[in-house]
Amino acid sequence: NATAKVYKGIKFRSKLELFTYRKLEDAGIDALYEKKKYVLQEGFRYSATVYEPHKTKGYIPTTTKIRDITYTPDFVDPHGRWIIEVKGFANDVFPVKWKMFKNYLMQQDDPPVLFLPRNQKQVLETIELIKEL
């Protein structure tokens, strides 16, 4: 359930994220919560003309800069060994960004182990697997 919760001054986006944080804490595992942003694709300007709808001006040519495509995982190991993305319910953008994120990480010398728990049981399994790393 995506109900925001505050714990120790940290605002978690869901109950499952809070559960994950507390279980990592209980296990003595250090984790950074939403602290590392990855740029999956740099922003740019399209060099040719693009016609797009505008709120008040109708269908017009635009030169709007395309912003960076970024990804901020939920939990990151400070030593770079693992990343946890807690996802109870995926939104429509998540599957594409997750694929882009995995592709980005594969370009690194030593990509981390990725975990995508979707419920409390999988969070507990994730923590046991992290202990073995």
What are these regions (language model features)?
Residues 1-133:
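Electrostatic, structured charged patches in enzyme active sites and in nucleic-acid/phosphate-binding
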